[in-house]
């Protein structure tokens, strides 16, 4: 059922507003403007350039001539008499002229230094090279730099071959360039995983922040049927909980992946719990990294991690910094136990 104010609205959709406004007289336009002012007194619906109304309805007296206006203003300025000063200037100078005081010239008097006759004789008979070596030993680098005989090539005390500068300069800082972007082709890698390429064993998507979330989910979906990729890393790719859930579903099916890196992302406790639940039945994954997420995971999540590590004997490396002492100790003991089991299996295999 149509509303009353929309009952006849369809009859006015094809009307031309410009044609209707053109047929209105001046009085009708003013009346329409008054009605619009009542509806929108602040003119909020109009652009800023159309809110100012015409201040006068007078017709122009003539065309605007800029040069004529400038000449008129200049003529008016020249004909206008300057205002007389209230206090006329008489030329009288008040006060005194500042004359700086002359400071007496300081005369430097040389201090007479008396040395022992042996030292006096040794310094008098010393060569330029010996004097340069002596100044270097005493730390008088300014003297060495100012003297013309500071070339100390072949000095016996191992003084540097170069001149000693007057200004101490800091160590030259070597420029540190940014790391190059990740050269991995995302679309090509996804295609090769989907085709189960035997040459593709490791996929590195680290620090590629423009990968869409659906594309990351596609990686998880294609890894379910892949039998060659053993290392997959997507650190710092802005992955969130839906991506973590997709990879958790992949871990329940995949029997080839050995290492998974999901550090430095936006995964919360819910996404981490999904990964932990998937690892309870996974027997192939040996390394998982989930540290440095956007927010702390909490004590309950850390307890679930420790419980999973105690049940899953295949995890040898677990990348997470525990905040609680209890889960940290349990996880460390579980990882140590798992590595000991691998060592025992290797020893038994060597004996057989």
UniProtKB/Swiss-Prot annotation:
Domain of life: Eukaryota
Tissue: Ubiquitous.
Alphabetical list of Pfam families matching this protein: Tropomodulin (PF03250)
Single GO MF annotation: microtubule minus-end binding
GO BP term, example: mitotic cell cycle phase transition
Subcellular location(s) per record: Cytoplasm, Cytoskeleton
Protein name from the UniProt record: Tropomodulin-3
Species this chain originates from: Mus musculus
Lineage summary: Eukaryota, Metazoa, Chordata, Craniata, Vertebrata
């Amino acid at each position: 059922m149509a509303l009353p104010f929309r009952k006849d609205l369809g009859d006015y959709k094809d009307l031309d507003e410009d044609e209707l406004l053109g047929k209105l007289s001046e009085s009708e336009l003013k009346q329409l403007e008054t009605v619009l002012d009542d509806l929108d007194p602040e003119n909020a619906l109009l652009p800023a350039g159309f809110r100012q109304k015409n201040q006068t309805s007078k017709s122009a007296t003539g065309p605007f001539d800029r040069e004529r206006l400038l000449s008129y203003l200049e003529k008016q300025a020249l004909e206008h008499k300057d205002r007389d000063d209230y206090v006329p200037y008489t030329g009288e100078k008040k006060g005194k002229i500042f004359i700086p005081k002359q400071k007496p010239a300081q005369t430097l008097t040389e201090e007479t230094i008396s040395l022992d006759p042996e030292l006096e004789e040794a310094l008098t008979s010393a060569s330029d090279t010996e004097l340069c070596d002596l100044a270097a030993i005493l730390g008088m680098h300014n003297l060495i730099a100012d003297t013309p005989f500071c070339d100390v090539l072949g000095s016996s005390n191992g003084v540097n071959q170069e001149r000693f500068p007057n200004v101490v300069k800091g160590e030259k800082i070597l420029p540190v360039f940014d790391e190059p972007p990740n050269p991995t082709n995302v679309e090509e890698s996804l295609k090769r995983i989907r085709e189960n390429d035997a040459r593709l064993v490791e996929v590195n998507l680290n620090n590629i922040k423009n990968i869409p979330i659906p594309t990351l989910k596609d990686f998880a979906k294609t890894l379910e049927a892949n039998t060659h990729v053993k290392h997959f890393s997507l650190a710092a790719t802005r992955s969130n909980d839906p991506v973590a859930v997709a990879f958790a579903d992949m871990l329940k099916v995949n029997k080839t992946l050995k290492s998974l890196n999901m550090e430095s992302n936006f995964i919360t406790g819910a996404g981490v719990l999904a990964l932990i639940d998937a690892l309870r039945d996974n027997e192939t994954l040996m390394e998982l990294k989930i540290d440095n997420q956007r927010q702390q995971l909490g004590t309950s999540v850390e307890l679930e991690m420790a419980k999973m590590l105690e049940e899953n004997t295949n995890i040898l490396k677990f990348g997470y910094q525990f905040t609680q002492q209890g889960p940290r100790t349990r996880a460390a003991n579980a990882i140590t136990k798992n590595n000991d089991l691998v060592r025992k299996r290797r020893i038994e295999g060597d004996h057989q």
